[in-house]
Amino acid sequence: MELAEKDKGRDFTLRNARMDDIDQIIKINRLTLPENYPYYFFVEHLKEYGLAFFVAIVDNSVVGYIMPRIEWGFSNIKQLPSLVRKGHVVSIAVLEEYRRKGIATTLLEASMKSMKNDYNAEEIYLEVRVSNYPAIALYEKLNFKKVKVLKGYYADGEDAYLMARPL
């Protein structure tokens, strides 16, 4: 899938990630997030969930990505305990100079659509640092709700919000 997007005068292209994008994805991960994963972790997720793993391209370079996975587990949003197929946003990042241009929103929307249509997920969830106000605002704009606080979730001891929404 390849989509051309225009937002605030910036052109970017969204497409499914490929193996030859992994090095650029890892570079973005290391530059923008304190949570870093080994090479094989990205490769496994791309092989297993590639239809929902997207990159944003500007001038032939990857400037953002979303890496998901699909899981079976208890619903994060239903009142009564029930097992559901759900999408999990493992990692999403956009290079700082390309933020606030609609790239993260577009990445999330494309991945959510694929999780629902290609993987039959019923809901989606993610974890976000309680101090990451811009990300929380983005997720709330996309109708994610704070489900609970995960105390000491991150390696540095910071708490996370678990946020979720139906697909």
UniProtKB/Swiss-Prot annotation:
Site annotation Plays an important role in modulating multiple conformations of loop regions and contributes to protein thermostability: residues: 75, 82
Documented effect of changing residue 127 to Q: 2.3-fold decrease of the catalytic efficiency and 1.3-fold increase of the affinity for Ser-N-terminal peptide compared to the wild-type
Main EC class the enzyme belongs to: transferase
Keywords: Acyltransferase, Cytoplasm, Metal-binding, Transferase, Zinc
Effect recorded for residue 88 to Q: 2.5-fold decrease of the catalytic efficiency for Ser-N-terminal peptide, but 1.5-fold increase of the affinity compared to the wild-type. Loss of acetyltransferase activity for Met-N-terminal peptide
Consequence of changing residue 129 to A: Slight decrease of the catalytic efficiency and of the affinity for Ser-N-terminal peptide compared to teh wild-type
Catalytic activities: N-terminal L-alanyl-[protein] + acetyl-CoA = N-terminal N(alpha)-acetyl-L-alanyl-[protein] + CoA + H(+); N-terminal L-seryl-[protein] + acetyl-CoA = N-terminal N(alpha)-acetyl-L-seryl-[protein] + CoA + H(+); N-terminal L-methionyl-L-leucyl-[protein] + acetyl-CoA = N-terminal N(alpha)-acetyl-L-methionyl-L-leucyl-[protein] + CoA + H(+); N-terminal L-methionyl-L-glutamyl-[protein] + acetyl-CoA = N-terminal N(alpha)-acetyl-L-methionyl-L-glutamyl-[protein] + CoA + H(+)
Activity's thermal dependence: Thermostable.
A Pfam family assignment: Acetyltransf_1
NCBIfam families per record: rimI
Protein name: N-alpha-acetyltransferase
Protein source organism: Saccharolobus solfataricus (strain ATCC 35092 / DSM 1617 / JCM 11322 / P2)
Encoding gene (name): ard1
